[in-house]
């Protein structure tokens, strides 16, 4: 008798995706982040759902409702901090996942890669809107500054900003719609994740060597299910440690001050996971130029497959490209640091140098080094 997981209409889809899926035998821990992102998404949706039961999206009561959740709701403090720090974990896993894709050449699966970029934008939009909801000082001013960037779009900019605000400033209408979209977007992200997996399973997984692994495949279960569960335990332990010992480590103290349109905080900055893009935005003295650079800092991932000049897929056997890759990582850390600093000397010039280096490495140096490596290997 055939096993039910192979015949049942629903179970056979799950079976072909998570049980009998042929996977390369050489996958390292860098391949854990996809499943970790799935866990992060589940944690965020669950904690977010319970938070939404107690939250009110009104400018008069939003801040107090978050205080009420932390003080009066059973384990409300835990829900709130799991949700806030869960977002940080989400982005740590996201950036490592994208970095893995860049290092090992996973971007050659163009459909999977493009859906991934779309997912990155969707998660960033969700996180931005979520940061506005507690209605603290940084929530209000962050929303004002970032939405105002759209006014740099020629001709329609000002109308577009007022349309998003639902008035002439960030106010009640803005908060209400941000809450609606913040609730809706994670479910759109979940649907996109399914499409992402659908495209991935059309081609099968890449592996660290970048060499086709068709002759050497192993079943996903039990080998990689066990490996993924270990990853879950490590990540959830890290998240629990952060939440229970220093829940405000990654937050901004200004967000414990209720939003006040008449008082601007000394340094307006987004959460740490947007600081690299914020630094690129600030490094250009022109508003429209800054907005374009900001968008391109993420959108540049879409042209990475076109810029792939190497005859090899992965960087595993390309030491020169590896050096450039880690230089890029160092540049991103520098940008993240600069994004959190005030706009003054020497931070301005460091930010501008790092921004130029970021685009220079991806657009010119990596393709050039790939061609040099091809030449050295007589390919």
Swiss-Prot record:
Family as reported in the entry's similarity comment: Belongs to the cytochrome b family.
Cofactor(s) listed: heme b
Name of the protein in question: Cytochrome b
GO terms for biological process, alphabetical: mitochondrial electron transport, ubiquinol to cytochrome c
Keyword Zinc-finger: no
Subunit structure: The cytochrome bc1 complex contains 11 subunits: 3 respiratory subunits (MT-CYB, CYC1 and UQCRFS1), 2 core proteins (UQCRC1 and UQCRC2) and 6 low-molecular weight proteins (UQCRH/QCR6, UQCRB/QCR7, UQCRQ/QCR8, UQCR10/QCR9, UQCR11/QCR10 and a cleavage product of UQCRFS1). This cytochrome bc1 complex then forms a dimer.
Presence of the UniProt keyword Transit peptide in the record: no
Compartment annotation: Mitochondrion inner membrane
Transmembrane portions of the chain: 33-53, 77-98, 113-133, 178-198, 226-246, 288-308, 320-340, 347-367
Gene Ontology cellular component list: mitochondrial inner membrane; respiratory chain complex III
Matches recorded under Pfam families: Cytochrom_B_C (PF00032), Cytochrome_B (PF00033)
Misc: Heme 1 (or BL or b562) is low-potential and absorbs at about 562 nm, and heme 2 (or BH or b566) is high-potential and absorbs at about 566 nm.
Annotated S-S bridges: none
Chain residues that bind heme b b566: 97, 196
Superkingdom, natural source: Eukaryota
Role of this protein: Component of the ubiquinol-cytochrome c reductase complex (complex III or cytochrome b-c1 complex) that is part of the mitochondrial respiratory chain. The b-c1 complex mediates electron transfer from ubiquinol to cytochrome c. Contributes to the generation of a proton gradient across the mitochondrial membrane that is then used for ATP synthesis.
Keywords in alphabetical order: Electron transport, Heme, Iron, Membrane, Metal-binding, Mitochondrion, Mitochondrion inner membrane, Respiratory chain, Transmembrane, Transmembrane helix, Transport, Ubiquinone
Gene Ontology MF: a single term: metal ion binding
Cofactor note: Binds 2 heme b groups non-covalently.
Cited Gene3D superfamilies: Cytochrome Bc1 Complex, Chain C (1.20.810.10)
Membrane protein topology class: Multi-pass membrane protein
Residue numbers binding a ubiquinone: 201
Binding locations of heme b b562: 83, 182
Organism name: Artibeus amplus (Large fruit-eating bat)
